Amino acid sequence: MRFSDQSDLSDLSDLSDLSYFIQQPATPTFSPLTNPLMPKPNLPPLLIATLLPLANALLSSCGKVENEFSDRRAYFIFDNQVQNNSVLASAMSPHSNVFVTVSMQTRYSGQNSYVEFNFVAGGGGAQQASKATAVDQNRGVVLGINNGLILGYGLLSDPPVFYAYDLQCPNCYSSTAVPRRSYPLTVKANGFATCANCRRKYNLSTGGNVAEGAQGNKLIRYRASTTGPYGLLVVN
């Protein structure tokens, strides 16, 4: 049946030809909810039980990386190309198994004063002080919680890892204690540090974990890098 114009609509005596338009079903519309492209996955329970622990392990490992470094404040930049401190240089030499402490003191000479950084090798070995330059004092220095850091390369990683720890025992020092007390660690020549208060022994080559004594927190660790024995040291 052909509709040439509106006048043709007046002759509707035979509507049989319209059945084609009435009876034809509408073209289905695609919906991602009612007609998904991919069928629902049907994972075996055994596979799910295997994948869940792996996912949890990955998530927990990410958390461990984030918690590897302390959120406490530390800031120290030392240019050993200028200072030529041999004690620090020994600690910034890979595979040397030398850890040193650094602290800051104010010295007085007559009516004048100056600041110096004192580096001491573990085990009460060599020590050498370096006078802070004007650049050092202008950019500021924060040697951890209470004026003390431990610096050195670990022996048990390849490539070797350069560590910077706080000198305070993480299991004895409390920032909320009244009065606040200092619990400095003693660095040994064999790559360990001990606390005279709690008797714990920490392994400096493995991230500062407790090696002997009661279980507890590992050493407070800061981000650190060095460009070489007589290069630039950065702790933050």
For every predicted segment, state its role.
Residues 35-48:
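Bacterial N-terminal signal peptides that target proteins for export
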Residues 58-61:
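C-terminal motif of bacterial Sec signal peptides marking the signal peptidase cleavage site
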Residues 55, 162, 188-191:
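Residue-level signal for mature regions of secreted extracellular proteins and peptides
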Residues 66-185, 220-236:
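N-terminal pre-ligand scaffold of iron-sulfur
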Residues 180-191, 210:
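Second-shell loop/turn segments in exported
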Residues 196-236:
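Short Fe-S-cluster ligation motifs
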Residues 26-29, 34, 49-50, 55:
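Ala/Thr-enriched low-complexity intrinsically disordered regions
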Residues 4-21:
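Short hydrophobic targeting helices and cationic amphipathic motifs
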